[in-house]
């Protein structure tokens, strides 16, 4: 396992390449622009997919989510659609376009579920810092470095419970989904969440952890993975 990405050969190569082309060539996630977003593909409409939205609130009422579900306008395979859950859903939806969806549609297109927040911005930085990070060890600031105001972190177990017990079941309730092709993708803090979910969650079989944030205080998922029982993770990739 590396800090670059966790991918799989089980999903289509086209999907893997398309994700890379969409997000890394543009630098849209690595160098985010925090300006308000305009209409996205769900607002404009697609010739290949149809979109629905759901809204959720965290149990403490502090965070508010918007979840877009894109379903191919094509009958599912006998085993069901593959499904890809993507964190930072506002930024994802801003970059999706019909040319990309047409590429997916030409093969065995997945259902795409973009999990974002109820904001006009591409990222809710405070919410994702809490939702995507594990409980952190406290570190003193380096000598000569001013201490920054703390950002609330460490809530990924709470968010993962909302994701796996509420969002996923409600999203898939009326869809024919292949559970063996259920994937999750995240970048930076989102990649850290995916890395930790690989250790802890059994719902997903395929994990895309792209450039996970592994700073000094965020090493715990990677360190814990070094001593895992391989048998326990058979069937995950």
Spans of model-derived segments:
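Residue in the alpha/beta-hydrolase core beta-strand immediately N-terminal to the catalytic nucleophile
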Residues: 183, 206-208
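Serine-hydrolase catalytic machinery in alpha/beta-hydrolase-like enzymes
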Residues: 79-162, 166, 170, 174
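The feature captures the conserved acid-bearing segment of alpha/beta-hydrolase catalytic domains
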Residues: 211-237
């Amino acid at each position: 396992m590396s800090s670059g990405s966790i991918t799989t050969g089980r999903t289509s190569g086209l999907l893997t390449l398309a994700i890379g082309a969409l997000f890394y060539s543009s630098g849209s996630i690595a160098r985010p622009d925090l300006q308000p977003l305009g209409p996205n593909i769900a607002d404009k409409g697609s010739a290949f997919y149809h979109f629905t939205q759901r809204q959720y609130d965290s149990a403490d009422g502090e965070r508010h989510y918007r979840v877009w579900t894109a379903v191919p306008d094509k009958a599912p395979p006998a085993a069901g659609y593959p499904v890809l859950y993507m964190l930072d859903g506002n930024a994802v939806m801003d970059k999706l376009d019909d040319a990309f969806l047409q590429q997916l549609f030409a093969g065995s297109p997945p259902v795409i579920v973009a999990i974002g927040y109820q904001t006009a911005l591409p990222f809710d930085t405070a919410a994702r810092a809490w939702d995507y990070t594990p409980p952190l060890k406290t570190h003193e600031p380096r000598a000569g470095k001013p201490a920054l105001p703390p950002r609330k972190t460490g809530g990924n177990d709470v968010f993962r419970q909302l994701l796996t017990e509420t969002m996923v079941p409600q999203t898939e309730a009326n869809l024919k989904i292949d559970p063996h092709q259920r994937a999750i993708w995240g970048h930076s803090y989102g990649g850290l969440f995916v890395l930790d979910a690989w250790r802890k969650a059994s719902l997903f079989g395929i994990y895309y952890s792209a450039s996970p944030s592994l700073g000094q205080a965020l090493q715990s998922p990677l360190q814990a993975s070094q001593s895992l029982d391989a048998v326990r993770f058979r069937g995950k990739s």
